[in-house]
Amino acid sequence: MKNLIAELLVKLAQKEEESKELVAQVEALEIVVTALLRQMAQTDQQALIQSIESALEDARPGSQVPVQDSEMLQQYVKKLLRHPRN
């Protein structure tokens, strides 16, 4: 029983570490996207944003992806593009 608990704790620690790595990757990508957007001319920036939003609309997943997940992704992308980090 103790071995089982120890194994579960090790697996939990590994999952937590993986989660931290994913958060760091997402934050790094946010910083890069924000920096790139800030370097673009306003018209180019708007054209890129519209292109990305249009591509997202065209790529809406089918019924195999929950609607809530799809909407969350779209909201996050819109937030990142329209209101980038400071």
UniProtKB/Swiss-Prot annotation:
InterPro entries: SigmaS_Anti-adapt_IraP. GO terms for biological process: cellular response to starvation. It is found in: Cytoplasm. One of its GO terms (cellular component) is cytoplasm. Keywords: Coiled coil, Cytoplasm, Stress response. Its main location: cytoplasm. Residues 1-42 form a coiled coil. It comes from the Bacteria. Belongs to the IraP family. Inhibits RpoS proteolysis by regulating RssB activity, thereby increasing the stability of the sigma stress factor RpoS especially during phosphate starvation, but also in stationary phase and during nitrogen starvation. Its effect on RpoS stability is due to its interaction with RssB, which probably blocks the interaction of RssB with RpoS, and the consequent delivery of the RssB-RpoS complex to the ClpXP protein degradation pathway. Interacts with RssB. This is Anti-adapter protein IraP. It comes from Enterobacter sp. (strain 638).
